[in-house]
Amino acid sequence: MGRPAFPVKSTAATAFGKTDSVFEHVIDPPEPLSTTWFRLEILAPVHNERDYEAWMSSIEHIHATAGFAPPDRGGDDWPTPRTLDQNLADLEHHRREFVAGEAFAYSVLDGDDVIGCVYIDPDGSGAADAMVRSWVRASRAERDRDLAVEIDQWLRDAWLLRSRRWPGRPALGS
């Protein structure tokens, strides 16, 4: 049983040379977004130490962020404390998903500092073109909504996603 199909048409024939994506149509992601206060980079092992520090210092804040409820509140088991090596394995997994066109994860940076992440996945509910979640570290909590709004606009304008489902953020995505 695979992930749900991603119902988006792309103008590109292949994404990263792959034609066997689990998405219904091949996605060729646009250039990562860059704004006056942050830039996106494809989440990769190069971010390991900075990513680890960002979310490990912000577990409670992330659990309070829309889309990241802990298991006792109906969410999944991330984030929970883990080792730097376990985080590296997770980043390698996200990178493989990106290259295969299965899901798209980005590190959010301000200069060289990792201040959050963005995850773009097929929408398992079928209610939207994509399911999107984002978080910022606790020390940047005031930017949480700003990040989500800018990402949503980028997904609409550059990715051409007509509808985006943001769990816990009903004002976004339509």
Predicted regions and their residues:
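GNAT-family acyltransferases
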Residues: G2-R140, V149-S174
